[in-house]
Amino acid sequence: MSSPRLAAAVAALFLVGGASANDLQNFTTVQDTDWTQAGVGGMRGLGSGTITLSGVSGSVTQAYLFWAGPTNSTDPNANAGVLFGGTSIFGTNIGFSQDNFWGFANSQAYRADVTSLVSGNGSYSLANFTKPGVEVNGASLVVFFDDGNDTNNHDVVLFNGNDANFPNPFDALGWNSSLSGINYASGTAAISLHVSDGQNFGGDDDGTLRINGTPILSGGIFQGNTLPSAGGGVDNGNLWDIRTFDVTSFLNPGLNTLNFQLDAINDALGLIVAAVDLPAGAAPVTPIPEPETYALMLAGLAALRLATRSRKARATG
């Protein structure tokens, strides 16, 4: 039988990763790569659409499909099974959050590895993205490839999740995600944000997007007008956006941290993907935990060490 103290210490270690499971989490870092992204909005009420991919000029190494929308289900697999390019796929749930005031119980977001189904540029059909009590807003495709030219490669850090900007019981208030340990020397850097539920409620509906506390854009940032529409959605927006922001000016030679924030104003939004595009060699191999995460880890390790010593003392006493 295991020691209660030992079990508590191990549990504390596991709680480190689960404290804010619905905020964006680091999914993967792809180093020394070429990449592109595409998406489609206007899928609400249809459940189908097409993503037209361009910019691929070499062999595909990884490809990921993301989608999200409101649901009346507590089943994490409620909208996991869909069709991509006519092939059935099953996504991983990457977070529950607020329904963004649509009268549903929640929203759910998903990710699927579609590397084997993406051969290069072209049109990829989407179908079966709605079910009874389950809707979808849009979808994104993120593709990594090798064009044979190492001089134009990047490091890309992918965050994913389902982070609503309005107060809700699923995740922390607003958007607030960080990437630490960026070893920057030179070159351009950018952040691409894939956002669910963008609509136009006026010129100041989205508030202010901040990088490291500095405002970079205010007003109508995510209006549901940055991507092709499948033909559904609502009158004032296609409910899905991808926007890219240059963040080079926020990096200095040496170690850096990038933090991005958006508050809640008039437009309820869900952040699904954040892709941090860095010069090759700049990305940390693994994300470096924030200080509070270190504190929890150290506390758990200390408890584990104490429990182990106590067991040894009882065994020899």
What do these predicted ranges mean?
Residues 1-7:
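Bacterial N-terminal signal peptides that target proteins for export
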Residues 6, 281, 286, 291-293:
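Intrinsically disordered, low-complexity segments enriched in proline/serine/threonine
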Residues 7-14, 298-299:
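Sec-dependent N-terminal signal peptides
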Residues 16-18:
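N-terminal signal peptide c-region/cleavage motif recognized by signal peptidases
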Residues 21-285:
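Disulfide-rich extracellular domains of secreted proteins
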Residues 289-308:
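A short, hydrophobic C-terminal helix/tail in secreted or cell-surface proteins
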Residues 312-317:
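Short, charged juxtamembrane terminal tails flanking transmembrane helices
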